[in-house]
């Protein structure tokens, strides 16, 4: 299990290096380093704001409401037990009043974390499955995945920004004074840069989902319960998907399961989530073939 975690971490690091290399390549198209510096500062600034406000943005998009222990005693008990086992602070708990079954965690660190379940997921999971899902979400917080996704987003935004600058610099002049990019550079950066950056950013998201599955199952000691929950969520999100609205699609990477109906999102390469079958297979491998009462 620890070998799988090391591999996930190494993959994430490699993807970050790839994004950084894209920035270097895109920036090399310009002889004026001011352009590169401005693009980096803008991207880092925007993503820093998103990082510090990630909880409010996500909770508002899902119309999530804070709940007390009297309103959600089972959810509180499970999260408190898991947080205590992990020696981490108790996060704030929310419920989103939607039938679409899903859950997510947000917040820049364990002391500013929030965990949200939809009404739909609370209706379809038994307590053991809910515990497994909450373990997965808490693992996102403990693994600092909001920070990782913010860094990936910032790097991808730099590449996209440089691509736009390259396009306009190439289209409207600047080559003759020795400060603009070559036409070949314009084509390469403006066409391929954003696509490559997006693919790498999504690959980071998928890698972190695998790691949250692994470490969440390790926290609860029940990988088969998470596998069972994912099976139910795969069916449930197809029967009751979220509407593909911009504010919801922007938060879809936070969800434990892709919240949109198949066919409304891009193909596997452009997905924020790994294939359910692969996630379930890995969890069953962790369980070592034990049935645990789940199929």
Swiss-Prot record:
Name of the top EC class for this enzyme: hydrolase
PROSITE patterns: ZINC_PROTEASE
Positions contributing to Zn(2+) binding: 136, 140, 209
InterPro entries (UniProt xref): HtpX_protease, Pept_M48_protease_HtpX, Peptidase_M48
Membrane topology: Multi-pass membrane protein
Any one GO BP annotation for this protein: proteolysis
Signal peptide segment: none
Family from the record: Belongs to the peptidase M48B family.
Enzyme Commission identifier(s): 3.4.24.-
Keyword terms of this UniProt record: Cell membrane, Hydrolase, Membrane, Metal-binding, Metalloprotease, Protease, Transmembrane, Transmembrane helix, Zinc
Pfam families the record matches: Peptidase_M48 (PF01435)
Cofactor(s) named in the record: Zn(2+)
GO terms for MF: metalloendopeptidase activity; zinc ion binding
Locations listed in the record: Cell membrane
Source species taxonomy: Bacteria, Bacillati, Actinomycetota, Actinomycetes, Mycobacteriales
TM spans (from-to): 10-30, 32-52, 151-171, 184-204
Residues of the active site: 137
PANTHER family cross-referenced by the UniProt entry: PROTEASE HTPX
GO CC annotation terms, alphabetical: plasma membrane
Cofactor note: Binds 1 zinc ion per subunit.
Name this protein carries in UniProt: Protease HtpX homolog
């Amino acid at each position: 299990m620890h070998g799988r975690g090391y591999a996930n971490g190494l993959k994430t690091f490699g993807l970050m290096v790839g994004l950084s290399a894209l920035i270097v390549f895109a920036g090399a198209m310009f002889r004026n380093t001011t352009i590169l510096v401005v693009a980096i500062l803008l991207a880092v600034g925007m993503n820093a704001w998103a990082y510090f406000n990630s909880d409010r943005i996500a909770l508002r998009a899902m119309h999530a409401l804070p709940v007390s222990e009297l309103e959600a005693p089972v959810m509180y008990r499970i999260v408190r037990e898991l947080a205590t086992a992990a020696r981490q602070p108790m996060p704030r708990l929310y419920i989103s009043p939607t039938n679409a079954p899903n859950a997510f965690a947000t917040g820049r660190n364990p002391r500013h974390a929030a965990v949200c379940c939809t009404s739909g997921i609370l209706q379809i999971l038994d307590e053991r499955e809910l515990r497994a899902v909450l373990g997965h979400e808490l693992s996102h917080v403990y693994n600092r995945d909001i920070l990782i996704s913010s860094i990936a987003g910032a790097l991808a935004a730099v590449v996209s920004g440089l691509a736009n600058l390259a396009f306009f610099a190439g289209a409207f002049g600047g080559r003759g004074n020795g400060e603009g990019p070559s036409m070949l550079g314009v084509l390469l950066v403006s066409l391929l840069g954003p696509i490559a950056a997006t693919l790498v950013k999504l690959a980071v998201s998928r890698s972190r989902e695998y790691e949250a599955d692994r470490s969440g199952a390790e926290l609860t000691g029940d990988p088969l319960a998470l596998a069972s929950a994912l099976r139910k969520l795969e069916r449930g999100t197809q029967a009751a998907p979220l509407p593909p609205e911009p504010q919801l699609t922007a938060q879809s990477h936070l969800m434990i399961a892709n919240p949109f109906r198949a066919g409304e999102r891009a193909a596997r390469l452009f997905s924020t989530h790994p294939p359910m079958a692969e996630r379930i297979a890995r969890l069953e491998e962790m369980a070592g073939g034990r049935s645990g009462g789940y199929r």
